[in-house]
């Protein structure tokens, strides 16, 4: 992340914001070269789904074969931490203010929505990546798919 996230949020709120940001971010292939969110969100979804069973399997396997318990617990904890790492990154990213280059792009997309006759709420403070995700999600729903080509 290029700049420090705005405001202070608790660690639990960071996970909640990460989950909200993951659900809000549009998973369009044209955004993938510019933003890492598509890759992080898909890896996090995969980790949420498969890492807890993998942790249980690892523990069960090591205990059943009479292996050492220490490495088994370490592996299980690492596997369980993978989804949390993704949600943490997404949560921190969601409250990070947009850099100047993306800020200009953010305002161009807002103007395109306004030109299309959509009501656009005024921006409060410096826009964050969450505001960009909300705007892009709305633009993908209400504008034609070529709006990214013009930017």
Curated annotation (Swiss-Prot):
It is a multi-pass membrane protein. One of its GO terms (cellular component) is plasma membrane. InterPro entries: UPF0208. The chain crosses the membrane at residues 46-64, 70-90. Keywords: Cell inner membrane, Cell membrane, Membrane, Transmembrane, Transmembrane helix. Pfam families: DUF412. It is found in: Cell inner membrane. Its main location: membrane. Belongs to the UPF0208 family. This is UPF0208 membrane protein Spro_3315.
